[in-house]
């Protein structure tokens, strides 16, 4: 986040703290929120928590001005979606709690006001995508630049963390593009490509970087290039030779690493093990 803010600030400069901001006193703040269409119940339940947060910074006055200006811009933006604006205000509360009121976060948004509109659109239209940002606010850097930092090293846990972030970032970026274009074929095609890349990278890690002895044939929605958000994977393993004990171990490791949930992004993918390849036969 700091790196992203530094780059943006160096290009565009610091924002003016005298720009539009929330009204100074509570009655005027409530009047402002009500004039934007927020319900009295929502304002009473959420606004005190939002406005009374304190920014973590060594330059309190400057960064508090940034925080209040961010609140003004974001709340004005979510009020453009009246059907969901009360829910969006609640999501904003969770988002700021997750961000822990870091000054670099507010600076990033103010130096790229288009980001305010983008995230507000996500909050207004997709609680699922909003949940991704709330659970992993550090994804904002990669979301801004539409790219992910390259992975250095081959530690299994670092690889899993990298692949998990890759999946979440794919859902966030492609999901946002879908909100703008409503192009469903493009969305499911990109999500399917991401699943292809993640599973091949995982197989390569399990095989120690060597040529994969295990091959995967995708079935179901994955095989039909129709993966959606939160889709599970259906597939079978293929081998060019009779399966050996080492092949079975690799398959077990693949299943475990694909579905384990202790990493920050949760599991990479879920697998429905109730499916039986031969009817009543076991897995």
Q: Each PLM stretch: what is its role?
A:
Residues 1-283:
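Non-catalytic regulatory/linker segments of enzymes
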